[in-house]
Amino acid sequence: SFDDFKSAAILIGTFDWSHEPLHALPDNGDGFHLPATIVHELTHALGILTQVSITPNGQYAFMNDYFGLWGQGLRDSNGKQAESGMTISIGGTDFDGDFVLDNDTYYSGVYFTGNHVQEVLGEGTTLSFPEIGLEQYEKLVPGLPVNGAEFDFEGKIFFPELSHIELQNGLLSHQNWRNWTIPMEAELAALQDVGLKFDRKQLFGYSIYASGSEDKLNEFTNTNGYYARENGQWLVGTPNETRLGIGLHIYGSYNKVTQAADILTVGEDAVGIRVEGVENHLTIDKNISIKSDGPRGAALLVSYGRDHTINLEGDVSALGEQGIAARFDFGDNILGNDQEYRGSWLWQGGYATADRILSKINGPLVKVFNVSGSLRGREAAIYIDESAFVEEINILSGATLEGDIISRWDPDNPK
């Protein structure tokens, strides 16, 4: 029995498990991604976890004996900090200093904050709760959105779960569709805020969580590169060797980003630049190198959203085994494609209905991809997955391409 264990154990149940290794994008088909699940559960064991109890008068409260740094970083829908023993109000009513959830649904205005998280998000950045097909919750929060009330595993008890970071499609979320196999940088920052000590920059060069608007793009020149690390410092010009590392991650929407520093990696499954969100404009400057030359590397990966514009003026390469220089691909769902499947204008299973489509995928993944620089990939210079529609590709004067151009786009694909 579990009572006999002298060390920790993770009980994950029986599913149709896929043992596919961790890659930049999941490739597990209809199976439930076992390695990604283990990473998810380990983050709970490492401290991203809320424990609640029921008081004699029937209210939920934060447990006194299991209230740590994660609990201290939680804020309710009014910005109030959680405290040990504080009662929790589900439904927006504040009784004598309760920790208030705006409503009794999955999204209720709760968020997590800490010094490391704020360092990653940047001053003044607010985040929305992700679009997953439920009735939308429009509130913006100055931290990491956290899930609210959920049913327990038996579907009997409705309780404040408060243990999952709700970044769009994130590994550490409770969303029904997730295409991340590793934590995003802001999630790693949360682990630092709950006490773990590690060099976050080994895995992420820089991340952009801020958003502009349709009327006014958020303009940013990224002078942060990605190289090897030593004693917490960049070794400029030396490629990073970290597996699954990412040089630049664009999470927010309506950004106009110019990449003005080299990104150099030879790590397995590493990514130069990963783009998500809606209507982001990315320019890779002339004389800038984005190199992801390790096995299964992707120099440019556009993995979610719609209507992005990419201008490639520099030197982009993925010269390792199975390397793809420019990859346009939503990837699989770590819960299995039979649970929910997404792509450009594609939404099946889960909360999907026949008469609507999620706004963030209601359009081409990429509106225009302009190439005037160098694009070299060992497996492909350009790869378009069956899930992803790229509206326009322009190979301009002065461009150099080495490698295949592969398009598998299929709006009726069998997944």
Which stretches of residues belong to each language-model region?
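Surface-exposed loop/turn motifs in large extracellular/passenger domains
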Residues: 213-402, 409-415
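A generic structural micro-environment signature
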Residues: 18, 69, 75, 94, ...
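Extracellular zinc-dependent metalloprotease catalytic-domain scaffold
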Residues: 1-39, 44-219
